Every structure is written in C-alpha cells, then in structure tokens.
Amino acid sequence: MNSPQQPFATIPQPRPDGTLQVTITYLQMTRAPTGSAGRSRVDDLAILRVRKPSVAFYRFLYNHVGEPWLWYERRALEDDVLAAILNDSKVHIYVLYRAGAPAGYVELDYRVSDEVELAYFGLFPEQIGIGLGPWLLRWAVETAWASGPSRLIVNTCDLDHPKAIIVYQRAGFSPYRQETCTITDPRSAPFWNQPPAGSP
C-alpha cells in the first residue's frame, strides 16, 4: 500500500553502487479472525477471480500497484516463467474493481500444503486513502482461511508504505522473523523501464 500524496516517500534515492539495503519482516496468522469484512464504505465495488490471467494483464496489475514500492520480483521474470505461475491452479488472482475499472488485486498462493501465502496485495495509487486497503485485506484473509489452512503468511519490507506492517498486525498477523539483505536496485535493471508486451 502507498500514499497518493507522497507515493515515493519511503523509497530511498539510488546509491552509487546500484544496491539497496532492505529489511524484510515475515508475519503469520495461526487462527482465523472473528467477524467478517462486511460491506465497504466505498460504493460500486466488485471482486472477481481471474482464472489463468494473461501475462500482459497480470503485468498491468503488478506494475500499477507495485511500481511506487519497487516491486520487482515478478517484473524480472520471463513471460513463460510468469505464465507457468499464473496458470497454476493453486495460485489465485482476485481483482478489485471500482466503478467497473481495476482498483487493486490480491494474490493467494496455496502451493505449500496446509499454508496460504498472501503473496501480493495492493491498491492502485489513486485508490489509496479512502478506506479500501484494510477492507480488502480483511476480505483476503477471510478468503484464505476458507480453505482451512494451519496458518496464513505474508511479508513486507521497509520499501512499503510505513503503515503497512501496522495494517497487517491490525488484521491479525504477528511478526515471527526479520532479515536485512542487500539487493540490486531494480531501477537500474533493464526490465524496469521496459514497456510490457501487448496490452491488458
């Protein structure tokens, strides 16, 4: 998640050596929360599962949600590798629509037995700040728990919105591990400025 007013507020300036130091926090939820997401206070919403989305459509979602936060892992994948993930029946993509247009997405990964990973979750920058984030997260948590796993996991890092970890904790996640690593700044990679092939 990010802020429409200052979308790059937490992103460090490029370093001369082309690297970034990132602290990753891993969180888990070992019991389903009580209650339900209910209705959002924002009107004209729909959440639809996209079965086997095209690579172009997925990249549109991933890049639009993730670019302000330097999401790069899926961006760096070749199309055939990404397509294999998207075509896996245990990877579920849900798109949030507002007034008929994409507003964000959720990716739930069921590939590990008895565990669900909230692999990706976020809103388009223009949809942030109106109360959609916590509601969509609660919806994602309820959907993940419906399969009866032992735990639900997610991770966030200090490139994300500064309130991201607070939102996860309020939803019921608890940190269980943290690590700091050095990565190549994705802004220096050829794929970063490469336009996606095709169109959504």
Sequence positions of predicted segments:
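Acyl-donor-binding surface of acyltransferase catalytic domains
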Residues: 1-51
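Conserved glycine-rich acetyl-CoA-binding loop
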Residues: 124-138, 159-163, 170
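Conserved active-site alpha-helix within GNAT-family acetyltransferase domains
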Residues: 5-13, 159-178, 185
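Conserved GNAT acetyl-CoA-binding A-motif
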Residues: 144-156
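Conserved beta-strand-loop-alpha-helix junction that forms the acyl-donor binding cleft
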Residues: 128, 154-164, 181-187, 191-192
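Short acidic/polar active-site loop segments enriched in Thr and Asp
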Residues: 92, 150, 174
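Short amphipathic alpha-helix that is part of the acyltransferase structural core
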Residues: 39-74, 194-195, 200
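A conserved beta-strand-loop-helix scaffold within acyl/acetyltransferase catalytic domains
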Residues: 73-80, 86-125
